[in-house]
Amino acid sequence: MGAPEPSWCFLFLPVLLTVGGLSPVQAQSDNYPGCECSSVSPGVLAGIVLGDLVLTLLIALAVYSLGRLVSRGRGTADGTRKQHMAETESPYQELQGQRPEVYSDLNTQRQYYR
């Protein structure tokens, strides 16, 4: 099978420290002898990590399910809107040939504003 990937090695580190009789928090506090920090047991630390993973998965599942519900609702509204637009006339006016009287009318109005 080969050696585990580097990310898996970090997951085994707390287990190895616990088997060795040293919790991960105690290993860090040994580096700072003046620190009077309360130690966290490995069970509490594992509970925090697992709880975080479970909550993250629940949030992802909720976002996914809500996303599917919203897209279904929009799909039906778009379908009826497209059918309604097909039944009515086009909102655009068709182009007609050049009409010089429109432009000549604009030129006469411009003289009044000068």
UniProtKB/Swiss-Prot annotation:
Membrane topology qualifier: Single-pass type I membrane protein
Topology feature Extracellular, residues: 28-42
Disordered: annotated span: 72-114
Top-level taxon in the UniProt lineage: Eukaryota
Amino acid composition bias (Polar residues), ranges on this chain: 105-114
GO molecular function: identical protein binding; metal ion binding; molecular adaptor activity; protein homodimerization activity; protein-macromolecule adaptor activity; signaling receptor binding
Post-translational modification: Following ligand binding by associated receptors, tyrosine phosphorylated in the ITAM domain which leads to activation of additional tyrosine kinases and subsequent cell activation.
GO cellular component, one term: plasma membrane
Site (Important for interaction with transmembrane receptors): 56
Membrane-spanning parts: 43-63
Keywords: Calcium, Cell membrane, Disulfide bond, Immunity, Membrane, Metal-binding, Phosphoprotein, Signal, Transmembrane, Transmembrane helix
Parts of the chain on the Cytoplasmic side: 64-114
One GO process term, biological-process aspect: regulation of osteoclast development
List of residues that carry Phosphotyrosine: 92, 103
Compartments where found: Cell membrane
Stretches assigned to the ITAM domain: 81-109
Secretion signal, residue range per the UniProt entry: 1-27
Residues that, per the record, bind Ca(2+): 52
Described function: Adapter protein which non-covalently associates with activating receptors found on the surface of a variety of immune cells to mediate signaling and cell activation following ligand binding by the receptors. TYROBP is tyrosine-phosphorylated in the ITAM domain following ligand binding by the associated receptors which leads to activation of additional tyrosine kinases and subsequent cell activation. Also has an inhibitory role in some cells. Non-covalently associates with activating receptors of the CD300 family to mediate cell activation.
Subunit structure: Homodimer; disulfide-linked. Homotrimer; disulfide-linked. Homotetramer; disulfide-linked. Homotrimers and homotetramers form when low levels of partner receptors are available and is competitive with assembly with interacting receptors. They may represent alternative oligomerization states or may be intermediates in the receptor assembly process. Binding of a metal cation aids in homooligomerization through coordination of the metal ion by the subunits of the oligomer. Interacts with TREM1. Interacts with TREM2. Interacts with CLECSF5. Interacts with CD300LB and CD300C2.
Family stated for the protein in its record: Belongs to the TYROBP family.
Protein name as it appears in the record: TYRO protein tyrosine kinase-binding protein
Source organism (scientific name): Rattus norvegicus (Rat)
Gene that produces this protein: Tyrobp
